[in-house]
């Protein structure tokens, strides 16, 4: 291959709507290592996820890169990804004889061992295995020198032909295996001289007593069960389990998508939907101390419906890491977020993971519907304030070091995400345009956690704060309730985002009674327009490669900074004349829109429909 890898085109060769296990066990057209193995859909999925290492180290547009990647799968991948260890067609292919130059030892090399040697340059064995010596060295390392232990191989993994090749004589003393050990072990040669009767007798005794402990002989002597073969991936079949749902996501993760599964749990509880929560850990850079739904977390699924509150790529990682057991026979719903205008072409294969998709906003729904082969349902998410937040109590400005007598605008973002999407610099620019340095009755609070100190946007924000004492930076990891108390201590939440899938932060600000200024684009428009938020006009702008995940061919909003500045001035003027509060009844309306009760009713209705359809089928 000479062209760069086009992931979407390669995945397009897989069958769709037959279940992930079956679809990903099919070979990818045009990707193979001749004489060793095809590259299967599951391989490509792993490679796609690992853009920081595997894509760099093993370019699939070269034969050597593909061979190196398959070697990595054998050496490391099968231990990291349960789904890979279950990829039966791959392992059956690797159990075949390697195609090598003929020699005394060539008939004992499997394709599995061939890939292992290719990936273990530290062994000093010619990776091409062209000579008899190299082939013998490979066999001895594997069966005679601990290789089987390094790879955690069992007797079930040793093909019958390889067993027969090495144990080719009824008498172990005269077998190829015994000769292999003698030729590579000078210590055995010295102790058991083969030209003497005593030496032969001693070697026979050693083979019987010591070899089973020092070598891989038991792998060759043990006969594995073959009457009942291992599970083979087949087109998806469902099981009939009791009413209820398994909610899957970052149960303890302190980030926005962790809130998705936590709010879904609260909605199910209020609606009387039986449920359990399966935790899937995010990256190590995410704090996992939110224990608000810990009482519902379990290790094993209990019900026949899965609702996966992760991104499509994290859902894929979940399948690859945990394997098929979590999904096999269960109706799986992908409650997937997305921010940009179009669903990524490179992610379309992920629809194989689900039976239907739930979209938390019309924005996501439209992006999904243009790409999805499975049904897409609009399912808004619940937004709930923690019990610790008392909206009737006095605000706590002094606690956060904020001035008591200013109109405060606030915005919060997670530095672990793409800062350019959240656009905090746009908020700073709008504030500076709205209010000259002589306007001392206003202030801007920028709350961030996990910022990248080297990020140029973050540096500009810090510089602006250093030059303008009205701008307050709070760079800290706060508990959820504390973040909301910070919001409540301010007057207006400003989000000049370029893209937003749902807009949970905006919704929380509304529940707290803050004025809201937000870009008139993204999932937030579902509730911002009806709620009377000040919406900022925008123009669609094409993204540059690397600006965001799957940016090629995408668009997002560029909010009008001048319009945002006018909105800030309007809020400040109104609040300076009188204490502006929510119109009568609007606070209650917000609770009706976002409440766990309202959302739980919608969930229950859809789940009941699914159970009824399942019963009829």
Language-model features: where?
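Short hydrophobic beta-strand element within catalytic cores of glycosyltransferases
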Residues: 515-518, 534-537
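Conserved catalytic-core segment of nucleotide-activated headgroup transferases in glycan assembly
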Residues: 253, 259-267, 275, 385-480, ...
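Donor nucleotide-sugar binding/catalytic pocket of nucleotide-sugar-dependent glycosyltransferases
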Residues: 355-366, 373-391
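Aromatic "clamp/platform" in nucleotide-sugar-dependent glycosyltransferases that forms part
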Residues: 498
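Extended catalytic core of nucleotide-activated donor transferases of GT-like folds
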Residues: 143, 224-236, 246-248, 266, ...
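A charged, aromatic-enriched C-terminal amphipathic alpha-helix characteristic of glycosyltransferases
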Residues: 555-559, 563, 575-607
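Short acidic alpha-helix that forms the nucleotide-activated donor recognition element
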Residues: 478-490, 511, 543-546
């Amino acid at each position: 291959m000479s062209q760069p890898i086009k992931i979407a085109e390669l995945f397009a060769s897989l069958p769709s709507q037959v279940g992930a296990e079956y679809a990903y066990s099919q070979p990818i057209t045009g990707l193979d290592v001749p004489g060793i193995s095809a590259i299967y859909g599951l391989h490509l999925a792993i490679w796609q996820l690992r853009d920081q290492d595997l894509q760099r180290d093993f370019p699939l547009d070269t034969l050597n890169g593909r061979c190196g990647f398959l070697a990595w799968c054998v050496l490391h991948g099968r231990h990291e990804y349960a789904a890979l260890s279950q990829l039966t067609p791959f392992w059956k292919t690797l159990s075949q004889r390697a195609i090598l130059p003929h020699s005394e030892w060539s008939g004992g090399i499997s394709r599995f061992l061939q890939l292992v040697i290719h990936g273990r340059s530290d062994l000093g064995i010619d990776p091409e295995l062209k000579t008899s010596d190299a082939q013998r060295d490979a066999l001895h390392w594997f069966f005679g020198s601990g290789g089987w232990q390094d790879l955690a191989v069992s007797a079930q993994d040793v093909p019958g032909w390889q067993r027969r090749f090495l144990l080719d004589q009824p008498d172990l003393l005269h077998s190829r295996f015994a000769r292999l050990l003698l030729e590579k072990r000078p210590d055995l040669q010295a102790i058991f001289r083969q030209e003497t009767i005593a030496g032969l007798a001693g070697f026979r005794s050693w083979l019987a007593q010591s070899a089973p402990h020092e070598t891989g002989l038991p792998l060759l002597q043990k006969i594995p069960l073959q009457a009942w073969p291992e599970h083979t991936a087949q087109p998806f079949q469902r099981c009939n389990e009791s009413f209820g749902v398994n909610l899957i996501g970052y149960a303890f993760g302190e980030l926005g998508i962790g809130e998705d599964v936590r709010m879904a749990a609260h909605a199910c509880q209020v609606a009387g939907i039986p449920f359990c929560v399966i935790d899937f850990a995010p990256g190590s850079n995410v704090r996992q101390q939110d224990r608000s739904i810990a009482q519902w977390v379990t290790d094993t699924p209990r019900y026949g419906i899965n609702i996966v509150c992760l991104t499509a790529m994290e859902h894929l990682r979940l399948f690859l890491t945990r394997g098929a057991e979590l999904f096999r026979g269960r109706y799986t719903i992908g409650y997937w977020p997305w921010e940009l205008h179009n669903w990524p072409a490179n992610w379309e294969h992920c629809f194989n993971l689900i039976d239907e998709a739930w979209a938390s906003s019309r924005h996501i729904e439209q992006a999904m519907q243009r790409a999805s082969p499975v049904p897409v349902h609009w399912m808004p998410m619940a937004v709930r304030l923690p019990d610790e937040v008392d909206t009737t109590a006095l605000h706590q400005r002094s606690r956060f070091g904020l001035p008591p007598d200013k109109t405060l605008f606030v915005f919060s973002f997670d530095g672990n995400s793409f800062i350019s999407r959240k656009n905090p610099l746009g908020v700073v620019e709008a504030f500076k345009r709205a209010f000259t340095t002589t306007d001392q009755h206003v202030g801007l609070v920028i709350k961030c956690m996990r910022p990248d100190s080297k990020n140029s946007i973050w540096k500009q924000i810090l510089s602006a704060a250093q030059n303008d004492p009205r701008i307050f930076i709070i760079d800290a990891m706060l508990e959820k309730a504390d973040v909301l108390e910070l919001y409540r201590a301010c007057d207006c939440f400003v989000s000049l985002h370029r893209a937003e899938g749902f807009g949970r932060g905006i919704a929380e600000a509304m529940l707290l009674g803050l004025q809201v200024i937000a870009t008139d684009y993204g999932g937030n428009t579902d509730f911002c327009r009806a709620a009377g938020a000040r919406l900022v006009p925008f123009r669609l702008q094409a993204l540059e490669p690397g600006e965001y995940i799957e940016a090629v061919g995408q668009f997002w909003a560029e909010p009008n900074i001048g319009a945002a500045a006018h909105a800030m001035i309007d809020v400040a003027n109104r609040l300076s004349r009188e204490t502006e509060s929510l119109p009568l009844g609007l606070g209650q309306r917000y609770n009706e829109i976002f409440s766990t009760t309202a959302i739980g009713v919608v969930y229950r209705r859809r789940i009941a429909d699914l159970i009824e359809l399942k019963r009829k089928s």
